[in-house]
Amino acid sequence: MGQKVHPKGLRIGIIKDWDAKWFADKKHYQELLHEDLKIRKYIKTKFYQAGISRIVIERASNRVKVTIHTARPGMVIGKGGTEIEVLRKELEKMTGKQININIAEIKVPEIDAQLVAENIAAQIEKRISYKRAMKQAVSRALKMGAQGIKVACSGRLAGAEIARSEWYSEGKVPLTTLRADIDYGFAEALTTYGKIGVKVWIYKGEVLPEVKKESVSTEGGE
């Protein structure tokens, strides 16, 4: 069976960037990594309905900058910025560091793989047919400008005795082309029969990596 490499991990440094932008020595790395995981888990749990796709964390000495990519910024910011201020204080209390929070709005959530996966998982939890949820997500993504999409659901689908995987795809999804901008998302649906895993790959077109401009010195003849 062919196993798939993580599409984002494969493209880091080429057309994708890190979600954690900091560096630490061996002594402090473990502590900071666990702090990152706590921050991400806390924000995702607190604002699960806000459609948070990505959380980017940057560090500088005793300061932490958190950028939240969300489809519903109003839900995270709150009325007059109350929610975001509460979140900032809670994170400062948790980490003991100065926290700065930025909000980045996701303009087209229909072609954000993580949000699509979470939406399908939420529908499966509401007992909507997984086939219907997959087909709707695929048609919406293509309508909103995706060049290709692939969705996989794995587990005891429709309460079957034996777990299986089902795929649905349309368009093209070139997984091994490094310049291909492929977004990947994963979510789990908690059903009475057990967990159902949902994976989504969305192809948004080709992106050429930025070439660093080097000054070429020309030698002139005397």
UniProtKB/Swiss-Prot annotation:
Keywords: Ribonucleoprotein, Ribosomal protein, RNA-binding, rRNA-binding
Cellular component aspect of the GO annotation: cytosolic small ribosomal subunit
InterPro entries, A to Z: KH_dom, KH_dom-like_a/b, KH_dom_type_2, KH_sf_prok-type, Ribosomal_S3_C_sf, Ribosomal_uS3_bac-typ, Ribosomal_uS3_C
Transmembrane segments: none
Ribonucleoprotein listed as a keyword: yes
PROSITE patterns: KH_TYPE_2 (PS50823)
Name by which UniProt lists this protein: Small ribosomal subunit protein uS3
